[in-house]
Amino acid sequence: MKITTIAKTSLALGLLTTGVITTTTQAANATTPSSTKVEAPQSTPPSTKIEAPQSKPNATTPPSTKVEAPQQTANATTPPSTKVTTPPSTNTPQPMQSTKSDTPQSPTTKQVPTEINPKFKDLRAYYTKPSLEFKNEIGIILKKWTTIRFMNVVPDYFIYKIALVGKDDKKYGEGVHRNVDVFVVLEENNYNLEKYSVGGITKSNSKKVDHKAGVRITKEDNKGTISHDVSEFKITKEQISLKELDFKLRKQLIEKNNLYGNVGSGKIVIKMKNGGKYTFELHKKLQENRMADVIDGTNIDNIEVNIK
């Protein structure tokens, strides 16, 4: 653990001295294709070796013409495939069957989108994205080089640029910030950044947290039928951002209650033990400036959801 911290700290100092993150991103991204280039030549030699014995029997023209002639007539429909899969020629019908077995599964996945109201398509696509959670990381903030500032988080030597919006812009100054947790959802941006996210920065836990908040759900479908459901939401952080809370709750509602199917309006109300509350409106994405807001996760009392 100490070696990892030292490595990340040295990398942080390197970023601060150079002041150029773009070069680091190129270096980080350059490492990934190198691995694919090393594996690529390993896959090509066996293919050339398979073709090489085919060229040798061709040198003896009399026997080769007699053997190749029936092979071409049998596989005349797919001549290129016979050259690639000549050894497992008996198994060639099996991949054809596997592709057919996949096709009946595709209609089942297509049945879900047909039930989705087009006006909820973008919201459903966003809140079903994969998310990432980085804990006890080092955040590096350099001088502003565009309209907004970024915290650079470097887990596994890949740089994620977290936009400092809302309260984060004044909360975090330039330099190195330790013991940082970040909840990441990659988003489109105008900066040509592949690993870009907004808000979701919190302080790492000082102790273990295992808190569960009850969730009461009332749903009215497009036919006016009202249903009720009860579930719970697990919280493992002392501090939790509204970005993480909003994203995880909506994703849970999509999976269990078909949010953004035929209905996608309503609200989520987070009720605190001290009487405060926070509201998420389901008909729109959480505002970017609120993605930086942080609340006490252990102080959440219960959550009420109304879907209509």
From Swiss-Prot:
Region (Disordered) residue spans: 28-117
Name the protein family: Belongs to the staphylococcal/streptococcal toxin family.
Q: Where is the signal peptide?
A: 1-30
Q: What is known of its domains?
A: The C-terminal domain contains a V-shape binding site for sialyl Lewis X.
From start to end residue, where is composition biased (Low complexity)? 77-93
Q: Where in the cell is the protein located? A: Secreted
Annotated GO CC locations: extracellular region
Physiological role? Secreted protein that plays a role in immune innate response inhibition by interfering with host TLR2-mediated pathway.
Specify residue ranges for compositional bias: Polar residues.
33-47, 55-76, 94-114
Keywords on record: Secreted, Signal, Virulence
Segment Sialyl Lewis X-binding: which positions? 180-278
Question: Domain of life, per the record?
Answer: Bacteria
| Protein source organism | Staphylococcus aureus (strain Newman)
Name of this chain's protein: Staphylococcal superantigen-like 4
